[in-house]
């Protein structure tokens, strides 16, 4: 996603900007679990429960169960052959377009001012976050729930673009400091009035920080305090993963495969997956969420979803001139094999992780109905995420190295 353009900071807040240190230059054991009665969100009334995960490839995309729920983009999607994934449950182009339109309106608000440039607004719509949340959260009870997920998604990408991508001013050696400030946009600092005012001015000075602050406010309006706290914790873990990646990039060091997979457990889509209950209009109680088995299922589903991104984005990353690593490249380095062979080995790793998730989810789903519903949400996210990536093949993604 292309980074937003920073708004000019008023001279009166320049000192606060300096204190904040933020500027535009900163840097298979049966089917997966299902909801007992199927999805209940917008556009899902005629949908059947999703079949088990399938290996996608020459067989093409799964057939929609309702003409009203399948946009034209689904039939033209291209998928990585042999990649094992649950199929998407709900794909609604009109609903995705509505979400995208509302996102542009939100991003243009004075307290966000994320994408003031026309080209960047078009890039936001081209990124298609609306379709992502429609695919990944088929049980969302309304548009505002989908918007809550979409705002967080856009804010997370703005933080990644600004603070982690060199082409947008990110710097590996300053990443930790700016990410701590980004965390404070959703996990407020508590200081004396004087320094709290400086902190607020610091947040106001940067579009990524403004967007995360606003997105979190909307999310808190529909989430419970425990769900909001869970999101803050998962974002902090994500930033820990960003820092691990930044350290390797700073050293130009390719980690071992096992180390990379450890990094991926933190530097993953986990914050997007673990809000599945809040976006679905219910709550998995904190005590159940903290159960080791649930945590394992969350980690596996998050890793699988992020490795899916590794695979689809490999060609784009290889074309860039910067030092970068992903599962295929670390396997190629460790096994001394071609990138094509490493790509196939990465598919196998992804598929094994999805199957491990399915096994864990099936076991957990028998323990509590809310756990079963949460496991279904994770499964929906894996399938929706894969479909969204496949929909961008030929534009930002590819099905081979």
Where are these regions (language model features)?
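Alpha-helical, largely C-terminal catalytic domains
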Residues: 1-401
């Amino acid at each position: 996603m292309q980074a937003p353009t920073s708004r000019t900071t008023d001279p009166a807040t320049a000192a606060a900007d300096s204190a904040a240190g933020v500027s535009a230059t900163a840097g298979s054991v049966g089917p997966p679990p299902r909801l007992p009665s199927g999805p209940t969100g917008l556009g899902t009334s005629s949908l059947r429960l999703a079949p088990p995960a399938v290996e996608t490839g020459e067989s093409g995309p799964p057939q929609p169960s309702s003409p009203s729920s399948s946009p034209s983009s689904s039939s033209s999607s291209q998928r990585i052959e042999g990649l094992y994934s649950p199929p998407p449950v709900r794909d609604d182009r009109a609903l995705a377009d509505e979400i995208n339109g509302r996102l542009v309106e939100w991003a243009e608000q004075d307290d966000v001012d994320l994408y003031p440039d026309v080209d960047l607004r078009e890039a936001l719509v081209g990124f298609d976050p609306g379709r992502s949340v429609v695919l990944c959260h088929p049980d969302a009870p309304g548009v505002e729930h989908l918007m809550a997920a979409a705002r967080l998604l856009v804010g997370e990408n703005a933080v990644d673009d600004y603070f982690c991508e060199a082409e947008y001013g990110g710097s590996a050696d300053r990443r930790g400091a700016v990410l701590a400030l980004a965390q404070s946009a959703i996990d407020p600092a508590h200081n004396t009035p004087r320094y709290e005012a400086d902190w607020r001015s610091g947040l106001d000075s940067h579009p990524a920080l403004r967007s995360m602050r606003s997105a979190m406010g909307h999310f808190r309006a529909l989430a419970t305090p425990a769900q909001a706290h869970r999101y803050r914790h998962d974002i902090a873990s994500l930033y820990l993963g960003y820092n691990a990646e930044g350290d390797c990039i700073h050293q130009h060091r390719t980690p071992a495969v096992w180390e990379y997979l450890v990094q991926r457990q933190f530097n993953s889509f986990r914050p997007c997956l673990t809000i599945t209950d809040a976006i679905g209009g219910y709550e998995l109680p904190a005590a159940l969420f903290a159960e080791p088995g649930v945590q394992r299922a969350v980690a596996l589903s998050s890793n699988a979803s992020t490795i899916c991104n590794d695979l689809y984005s490999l060609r784009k990353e290889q074309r860039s001139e910067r030092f970068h690593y992903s599962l295929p490249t670390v396997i190629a380095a460790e096994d001394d094999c071609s990138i094509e062979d490493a790509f196939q080995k990465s598919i196998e790793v992804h598929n094994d992780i999805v199957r491990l998730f399915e096994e864990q989810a099936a076991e957990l789903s028998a323990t509590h109905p809310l756990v079963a519903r949460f496991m279904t949400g994770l499964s929906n996210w894996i399938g929706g995420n894969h479909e969204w990536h496949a929909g961008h093949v030929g534009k930002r993604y590819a099905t081979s190295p």
